[in-house]
Amino acid sequence: MMSSEQTKTRILETTWKVLETRSDKNRMSDIATAVGISRQALYLHYPTRAELLIATTKHIDKVKKVNQRLELSRAAGSGIERLHFFIKACGGYIPEIHGMSVALRNMRENDKAAAEAWDERMQAVRHGCQAAVRAIEKDGKLKSDLSEQVATDILWTLLTVENWERLVLDCTWSQSEYEIKMIELAEIALLESGKARN
């Protein structure tokens, strides 16, 4: 018999697989069947579908070691270093979660739970963007005509999955080229002229 934690892990792994394969069998009853438990048992662990999808995205982050990926950014000695490391961490993560992101984005228009899960993930990215902007501002290198909110909006928009898709999938940029160009664009958009590499 599986422990509660083992069951939760199995539920999250199964939900992840369902999302990545873009299966339309993603209702709570479908997930329960795929896991091999009753729907009632699934609801004991995750009372709502939104909670299940959000927990799944957080599980993916844990498995993919997102916190470790962000360590360089969080420990950076300057705002510009933080910006660079954050863009590399965030941009480098997109290809690994792309299948799941496509599924949630496709479902969100007609699926409140999927929309909530996707929005929660995007707010986490926005929080990282805001931290990078604050570090740049603290160093006195943020463009004087940008507020923290506007600068965060700009960086958050640059780092969207949709932009990655356009440049890497449609325009066939390499992942490395994408990350380098996003850093360059972020510097142009956010930093006072002449302060990029100081």
Residue ranges and their predicted role:
Residues M1-Q6, N198:
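N-terminal intrinsically disordered/low-complexity leader segments
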Residues G92-R105, A113-D139, Q149-D153, E187-I188:
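Amphipathic alpha-helical packing segments from all-alpha helical-bundle domains
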Residues Y46, N106-D111:
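Short helix-capping/turn signature of helix-turn-helix
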Residues R10, T14, V18-E51, A55:
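Helix-turn-helix
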Residues Q68-E96, T152:
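Hydrophobic alpha-helical connector segments
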Residues M28, T57-K65:
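Short, basic, alpha-helical segments at the C-terminal edge of helix-turn-helix-like DNA-binding modules
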Residues E137-L185, S193-N198:
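Hydrophobic/aromatic-rich alpha-helical bundle segments in the mid-to-C-terminal region
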